[in-house]
């Protein structure tokens, strides 16, 4: 193609795409994804934002010792020639080159029912109390994170690839307001300004040889032409939240944390990407652990190059301490969560790991995370305040594959550790067929002196997304509140387990099913009197979001954690649907006021 015809082609492409965009923005399109109907439209602007604020680096109030890696200045707000060309090329890949999508990355399958995204944000909106009353102990906010793609995917899409959206119900003196906002990540901002998806999807980007090569070339072209800069982060911040050192973070393990805050009205604001005064240069886990006694926070990161695991901590003031690289982990394991005790940190090296052979990944397709059936799972135990890995001990635990940890504690004067965690019995299905996953909660005791490992099942049910009273983190705890998979990732109820009943095969002591066609999310325990050291461990409430797929109505449920049926204390009708998501937490009102 000569220069004249090339110019004509690019000009025509730009005109066509610009016309399509104008038509799309002027007349929203109703799209049906299985049983869910969603409206395709441009994402709305946060009313609490304005252009001046978005274009200036944000700072934390009354704090000057830490660095916010803010989003860069606003990019070109209109469709450019290069953007139009790249978007057209991507449409060609999706339409003509991609092989038929596997169910795990087929948007029509992945985004069915209440997994379908809400395609606009919800400003603070009053909620209706339809049962009981909201206890004063719940003054504060329950916030849950989860994937919600800003744009409906045109090609392969995995559940883990969605942009992070926070759903916060703020409660004050028996009244509640709901707000749903995207975490304004660098990725979100770039794609919002472009008007289309730009950055590659990690879990669904490898889908056949030709398509994978084409997407790789397209990604390189976008970077080289300055459409986005991966140095600014490509994370989604869609996994969880953490509150420590008087800061609230939205987390995803592929990037730095994003600092967020709730306003007095209940609105959610993204402050910016946070690097802890330049000391956190890379990603960190979405499951940091804050010691309820010392106020310190412990975390790690993992990656595809040595050291495959790096352990670190933050002091009670939020100052990051030095890294402890763990070179005794000899292959890149998928390390999503870990546990701490009073004296130790515990890591799980499982049969799920990163696929390092890029040629095989391109040729075979599938997820960049795969199963190694020839590998024996191990648990690694390191002193909590270790300066290096010299005292790290590894223990083989055949068949023990955990994604999440529930709690852990020391026994026998620190010579043994106990770990409570859901063991995934079918680890090979974790990313491709979540409906076939069965997680069996186990109690594992490791004698650090003799190396003997003892295991005992706590429940035969399919349980995950389990929590405890946060005040007992790292200490001997009795009660666990776990979500019932029916099948995963749908959650049909919650059970309460008493792990002290170790002589029984099923330690279930309470259960609450949500009803036919109703599914919920991860439960969270909120203490009735968190400042009372004499309070019983289960004296509090279990809260979660629940959605009725028959009526299309979403609710916020408050359950009595001590009652044998987890009796519903209060139910709040939400002003609109809250999609299923991942992890959340409750932040009390006094802590919200510190943000």
Curated annotation (Swiss-Prot):
Residues 55-64 have a biased composition (Basic residues). Fe cation binds at residues 287, 336, 404, 583. One of its GO terms (cellular component) is chloroplast. It comes from the Eukaryota. Residues 41-74 are annotated as: Disordered. GO terms for molecular function: metal ion binding; oxidoreductase activity, acting on single donors with incorporation of molecular oxygen, incorporation of two atoms of oxygen. One of its GO terms (biological process) is beta-carotene catabolic process. Keywords: Chloroplast, Dioxygenase, Iron, Metal-binding, Oxidoreductase, Plastid, Transit peptide. The keyword Chloroplast applies. Residues 1-34 form a transit peptide. Mostly expressed in flowers (e.g. sepals and petals), siliques, seeds, leaves and cotyledons. Induction: Probably proteolytically degraded by PGM48 during leaves senescence. Not induced by drought stress. It is found in: Plastid, Chloroplast, Plastoglobule. Its EC number is 1.14.99.-. Binds 1 Fe(2+) ion per subunit. It holds the Pfam family RPE65. Its cofactor is Fe(2+). InterPro entries: Carotenoid_Oase. Belongs to the carotenoid oxygenase family. Interacts with VAR3. Interacts with PGM48. May be involved in carotenoid cleavage. This is Probable carotenoid cleavage dioxygenase 4, chloroplastic. It comes from Arabidopsis thaliana (Mouse-ear cress). The lineage of its organism: Eukaryota, Viridiplantae, Streptophyta, Embryophyta, Tracheophyta.
